[in-house]
């Protein structure tokens, strides 16, 4: 987990911060996170943002996903388990598999390295910490593996 954690900041850009972060069909108030960079979010923010991933626009989902990875890796390294981020991780993983099933192109916008980081994060989390049932967890890891393979073929 620590290797991915250290590379995290390099793999995902901090700027630009997206302006339109809410899906147009959603009405929840997510001003708490508006204008904040993903790197500025900490474990204590989890109680305020755990349900935001379901209302995020695709752009905001891609932008803020590294925050969840960063926060959860920090906890796994420090406590050997998820602490404050457990519900945030569950909701994010549930939302991630839903978005994959709806539109895989959302994930094609991630780079090869970013996709590898997301997959490593899921594998390090393990099925029990992801909040996903075994089928959804395997499907999520498989989709990420296929997208990584697709990116590596494009690079040839």
Residue ranges and their predicted role:
Residues 1-5:
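Short, small-residue-biased leader/transition segments that mark boundaries at the very start
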Residues 13-16, 20, 80, 150-151:
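Short, flexible coil/linker elements and helix-boundary hinge sites characteristic
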Residues 15-55, 59:
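Short, contiguous, well-structured surface segments enriched in hydrophobic/aromatic residues
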Residues 62-156:
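Extended alpha-helical scaffolding segments
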């Amino acid at each position: 987990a620590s290797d991915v954690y250290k590379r995290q900041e390099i793999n995902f850009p901090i700027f630009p911060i997206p302006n339109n972060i809410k899906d147009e069909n959603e009405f929840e108030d997510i001003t708490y996170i508006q204008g904040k960079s993903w790197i500025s979010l900490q474990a204590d923010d989890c109680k305020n943002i755990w349900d935001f991933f379901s209302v995020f626009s695709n752009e905001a989902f891609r932008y803020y996903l590294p925050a969840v990875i960063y926060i959860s890796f920090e906890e796994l390294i420090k406590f050997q388990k998820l602490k404050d981020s457990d519900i945030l991780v569950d909701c994010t993983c549930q939302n991630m598999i839903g978005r994959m099933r709806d539109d895989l192109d959302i994930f094609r916008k991630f780079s090869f390295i970013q996709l590898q980081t997301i997959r490593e994060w899921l594998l390090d989390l393990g099925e029990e910490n992801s909040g996903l049932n075994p089928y959804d967890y395997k499907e999520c890891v498989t989709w990420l593996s296929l997208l990584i393979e697709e990116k590596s073929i494009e690079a040839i």
